[in-house]
Every structure is written in C-alpha cells, then in structure tokens.
Amino acid sequence: MLRPVSVITVTNGGYFFVRLLVEKVREFIGQREYEILVIDRGSRDGTLEWLKQQPDVVLIKKRQWGRRHDHGEAAELGVKKARYEAIALLDSDAHPMQADWLSLTVDKLDERVRLAGATFRDKHEGNPHGWYVHPHFMTFLKSDLEKLIILRKMRGHTTDTGEEATIRVLEKGYEILNYPLEFCAQFAVGHPRVPTVSAGVFHAWYVTRLFKETATVDRETGGAVTRENYMHPLQELLRKTYKLNY
C-alpha cells in the first residue's frame, strides 16, 4: 500500500498557478490516499472561490499581517492540520510533472531519511552547509515538526524560509535526499535559469512576488523577470502545452 500524503501549499493570489497545482497533484498522485491543504493569506483574484468548490481541498484562511504571520508560519499551520503523517510541501507556483515525484521523496522517508526534496545552493550566513532543501518542494514527516522540521525563520535574515529544517536534520545526524535543481527547458521563455524542475516537480519561481512585490523583483533581477517578459509568456506556454482553458 502506498503511503498516504498530505499535500500543503500557501497561497496569496495566483489563481492560474494554484489551480494548475491542484489539477496536476490529482493527475500524478497515483493510487494513494491524499488531501490537499491550502493555507490562504488573502487571495482576492478568484482563487478562494475556486478552491471552495474542490472536494479534495481543505481550505484554511490565515490573513497576512505583521510578525509571526509569514509564509513559514502559514506552512507550519498546514502541517499541524494535516491528516496524514507524510507531508509534501509545494509552493503555489509549483506542480508535479512526473508520476514518480512522490516515490522519489515521500516514499523514501524512514528512520534515517527525514527530509527529501529540491536542493537550492547558496551561501547564507546562518547555514554552514551552503545548500538546503527548498520549501517549493519539501517532503518530511508530520511528527518531526518543531523537532527536526521548522519552516519559519529562526535566524533572522541569515537564513531563508524552510532552511532551518535542513540545518536541524543534519545536526541531529539524520540523512537528506536532496535532488538537484535543473533548468526546465520544456517551459523556457527566455530566462536562462528559470523555471526549474527537481525530482519531477516544476517550479516557476517569482510568481507570488510578481503579484505583491513587482518593483522589488524588477530591481533584483535587473528587469529580467517581469509579468510581461516572464510570467505572462510562461502562462501562455503552460496553457498551450497542457491544453488549459483558464
């Protein structure tokens, strides 16, 4: 019997990508019990209305305001509400592309392997390892929350959301299955590094921030990532490839 799984994502707008995530989870979930938990932080673009109509989606509203209400805290709330022990955390602009996305990750969690997913490499002051399992695709066990798995930031700006989990798992002597991030040429729209795919999961990157922090993303990327030159062409390519009508 395949391990049941709770798929968790945090949303704040981005109807197109959220709907695509839900539909692709259904397509590639296989013969296992599952649920999809969506923690919404204030969507106003039709995302909530569509999610409320989905029988396999558990919708949890958590308004975004002030400290202790960031992405990591919202994701942790989803884990606490999850029905199943195995957790697959996805960013709202990610989705599975292959049938083996869970057999590569969730199904390999055991007494030694406590974390599996997509590896992001960067030098952050608070992380001595130079890499971590990125929360756009991270799998772990619910019972490890607060012990090995912490999704909120614990070290200020010296680490990123979700990075604490990798640090703690390694500190305690457990193993991690870390899959490389690769450029997803199938959905290339002109940017040399994004979108990506890892362990069968696609990630668009930047989408939520393009809705909420457009000017910041434009400045950080030197204009290489905008709604016009990245997000909109990517949506059109996804529509064409997957034959979507939304």
Q: Where in this protein do the model-derived segments appear?
A:
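N-proximal low-complexity "stem/linker" segments adjacent to membrane-targeting elements
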Residues: 1-23
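Conserved catalytic core of nucleotide-sugar-dependent glycosyltransferases
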Residues: 97-167
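Short, acidic, metal-binding catalytic loop of nucleotide-sugar glycosyltransferases
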Residues: 24-33
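A conserved acidic beta->alpha catalytic loop
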Residues: 40-48
